[in-house]
Amino acid sequence: YRDFKPGTVMTPREGIVLKSAMLNHPGNAVGYRLEYGGKVLTYMTDTELPADKIDPQQLALAANADLLVFDCTYTEGEIASRRGWGHSTWQEGVRLADAAGVGTLVIFHHDPSHDDAFMDGVAREAAAARPGRAPNGLPRAIVAHEGLTLSP
């Protein structure tokens, strides 16, 4: 365990770089960027992107990541009544991933009211929005599910 201030660059071991930034969530949350062996994993849970734009801190954290695990709790149809709750839509996740040059977007932090059939629909729509495969060989958009294991 180590205390740190978001924005601090840490090197817990030789060759490992860990960056962080504050996220937009009531009560605060921190996002992380892990760089190791020429690969980048960005993890952003509990964050709400500003409406119709991308937060520059989040864009920098996600820049050219092989994997972006991102809070995609809602859909665009649901977000209007949930603004200020500190969560994003999968469509916002796609926009962030595209703007940041992300290889694979991992859609996670699902709304508990979304069942498997609903999430299968999100997976189809996200795959259509980010078709093809990333340089890492993975699809450009994946919906996280129990037991999923990924390697950048």
Regions found by a protein language model. Give the residues of each.
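Cap/insert and terminal regions of metallo-dependent hydrolase folds
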Residues: 40, 48-145
